[in-house]
C-alpha cells in the first residue's frame, strides 16, 4: 500500500522548545523536530514546512491566515496536514481554521505537547504519532485536534489543564475518536463535504470577547463599541446580564453586532 504524504507545518510552541536560562524557547527547526521520531516514516511519507517559530501566546489572526494559506498552496500535493502548535492558543487556531477552511476532504490536525520533544520524559512523541495514525485513517477529514490520545472537532476543543498530558476536552460535543496504539477507535464519523474545499483569506480582527463579572462598570461599553466591530458577551448563567450593562448595550447598539453566550462549558 502506498504511504500517504503528510505535511508537518511547524509554528513553534513548547513541542519545539529547548530549555534556556530565560526559560523555554521554541528554537527547533521542523527537520529537527521530526528527527526525534524517525519511525514515522514507517507510517507515512512526512515532509515539513516551517511557518514560524514563536510562543503560541504571540500567535494571532495573521498566523491563522498564514496557516490557511500554506494549506491551500499545498492542498493538492499532500494527503493530510499536521500543524505543530503551542498549547496555549491551539484551540483558538483550530476554531479559526475550521471556518477559514470549509468542506475539507483531507485531515487537518493540530497538535502540540506539554513537554518539549527533546525532554527525556515528554508527551510530544505520542501526540505526533497519534496525529499520524489519525491522519492516515481513511475516515479522517476536516480540522481536528489530536492530543493525549483524544481526537476533538476543531470547533469544540478547549484547553482545561495546564500541566497534565490530558490537556484538552471537547465542549458540548462528543469526542470524534480515540487513538489506541496504531489504531483509531472512531466514535463519530466525519461528515462528507457538501461541496469543493473553500479557503477564506479574510478575517475581521475587531471581534471582542467580553466576560461579565459582578460589578463591571457600564462605562466600559461605549469604548468597546468604539474599538470593535462585534462583541461576544459571556453572560451569567444562560444569558443573565445586569440591568446597568443591559442599558449600556441598548444605548449604543444600533446596527452593532452583539452576540451572547454562556460561561458554562456544559449544557449550553
Positions of the model-derived regions?
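Conserved small/polar residues in nucleotide/adenosyl-binding loops
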Residues: 260-267
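ATP/NTP phosphate-donor binding region
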Residues: 1-73, 247
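Short beta-strand segments
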Residues: 9-11, 83-85, 109-112, 144-148, ...
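Short Gly/Thr/Asp-enriched flexible loops that form oxyanion-binding sites at enzyme active sites
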Residues: 84-106, 241-249
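A short helix->loop->beta-strand "cap" motif at the edges of active sites that frequently abuts
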Residues: 105-106, 254-258
Amino acid at each position: 500500500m502506498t504511504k500517504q504524504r503528510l505535511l508537518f507545518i511547524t509554528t513553534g510552541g513548547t513541542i519545539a522548545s529547548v530549555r534556556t536560562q530565560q526559560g523555554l524557547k521554541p528554537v527547533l527547526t521542523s527537520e529537527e523536530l521530526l528527527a526525534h521520531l524517525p519511525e514515522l516514516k514507517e507510517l507515512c511519507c512526512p515532509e515539513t514546512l516551517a511557518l514560524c517559530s514563536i510562543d503560541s501566546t504571540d500567535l494571532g489572526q495573521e498566523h491563522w491566515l498564514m496557516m490557511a494559506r500554506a494549506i491551500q498552496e499545498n492542498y493538492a500535493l499532500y494527503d493530510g496536514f499536521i500543524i505543530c502548535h503551542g498549547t496555549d492558543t491551539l484551540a483558538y487556531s483550530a476554531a479559526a481554521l475550521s471556518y477559514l477552511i470549509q468542506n475539507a476532504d483531507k485531515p487537518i490536525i493540530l497538535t502540540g505537547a506539554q513537554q518539549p520533544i527533546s525532554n527525556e520524559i515528554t508527551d510530544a512523541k505520542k501526540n505526533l504519532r497519534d496525529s499520524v495514525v489519525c491522519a492516515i485513517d481513511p475516515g479522517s477529514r476536516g480540522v481536528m485536534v489530536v492530543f493525549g490520545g483524544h481526537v476533538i472537532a476543531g470547533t469544540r476543543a478547549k484547553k482545561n489543564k495546564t500541566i497534565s498530558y490530558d490537556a484538552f476536552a471537547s465542549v458540548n460535543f462528543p469526542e470524534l475518536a480515540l487513538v489506541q496504539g496504531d489504531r483509531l477507535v472512531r466514535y463519530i464519523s466525519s461528515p462528507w463535504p457538501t461541496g469543493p474545499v473553500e479557503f477564506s483569506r479574510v478575517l475581521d480582527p475587531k471581534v471582542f470577547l467580553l466576560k461579565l463579572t459582578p460589578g463591571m462598570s457600564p462605562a466600559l461599553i461605549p469604548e468597546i463599541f468604539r474599538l470593535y466591530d462585534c462583541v461576544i458577551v459571556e453572560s451569567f448563567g444562560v444569558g443573565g446580564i445586569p440591568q446597568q450593562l443591559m442599558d449600556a448595550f441598548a444605548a449604543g447598539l444600533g446596527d452593532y453586532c452583539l452576540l451572547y453566550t454562556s460561561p458554562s462549558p456544559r449544557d449550553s
